[in-house]
């Protein structure tokens, strides 16, 4: 047999963050999670985020909805003025800190309040469960957002880059996740 052979099976890849919110975990501040995403042909396919402190398991499979401990969840319908904004400060990128806090302040003026937890996975799941309305961070690695972004989307939310582009699993990028009623700063 000669020539190139190809495999007809889809390509799967796990994208894992064994401790999302590492600094919180080290400091015994109980806001961290285990985040496991499964990509199929480069796209988000399955997402699982487990918060061991609250015994909360968030799950989603593309096209099948999002769940918290087996019960369906959905993003809130609140407008930004009645919403909580969650944000991350991209702590490993000092050059982004000023812009992160400027954005948080701008959202603070328009929203009910703002919060910073230190766990992107938990923040994304908070959007999915309707506990908050918007989350942003100016630079995340795929293992930070792969599982949580799918959970948000399957709960009826919208995930993009802060700039409005598509979030891809192949590189670091900014992330903006919303309930669909809240959006980018103008």
Predicted regions located by residue number:
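Buried hydrophobic positions in well-ordered alpha/beta secondary-structure cores of metabolic enzymes
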Residues: 21-22, 85, 127, 152
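Short, small-residue-biased leader/transition segments that mark boundaries at the very start
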Residues: 1-9
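Glycine/serine-rich anion-binding loops at beta->alpha junctions
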Residues: 12-31
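Acidic beta-strand-loop-alpha-helix segment within the catalytic core
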Residues: 36-124, 172-186
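Oxyanion/phosphate-interacting regions
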Residues: 102-108, 122-186
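Short glycine-aspartate micro-motif
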Residues: 13-15, 35, 47, 135
């Amino acid at each position: 047999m000669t020539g190139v052979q190809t495999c007809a099976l889809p390509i799967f890849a796990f994208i894992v963050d064994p401790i999302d919110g590492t600094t919180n975990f080290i400091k015994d501040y109980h806001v961290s999670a285990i985040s496991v995403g499964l990509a199929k042909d480069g796209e988000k396919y399955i997402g699982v985020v487990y918060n061991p402190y609250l015994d909360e398991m968030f799950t989603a499979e593309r096209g099948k909805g999002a769940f918290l401990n087996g019960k369906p969840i959905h993003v809130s319908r609140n407008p930004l003025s009645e919403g909580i904004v969650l944000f991350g400060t991209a702590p490993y990128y000092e050059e982004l800190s000023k812009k992160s806090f400027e954005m948080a302040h701008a959202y603070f003026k328009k929203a009910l309040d703002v919060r910073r937890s230190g766990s992107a996975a938990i923040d994304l799941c908070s959007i999915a469960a309707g506990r908050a309305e918007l989350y942003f961070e100016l630079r995340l690695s795929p293992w930070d957002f792969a599982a949580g972004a799918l959970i948000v989307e399957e709960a009826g939310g919208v995930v993009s880059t802060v700039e409005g582009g598509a979030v891809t699993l192949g590189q670091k990028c900014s992330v903006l996740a919303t309930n669909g009623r809240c959006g980018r700063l103008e």
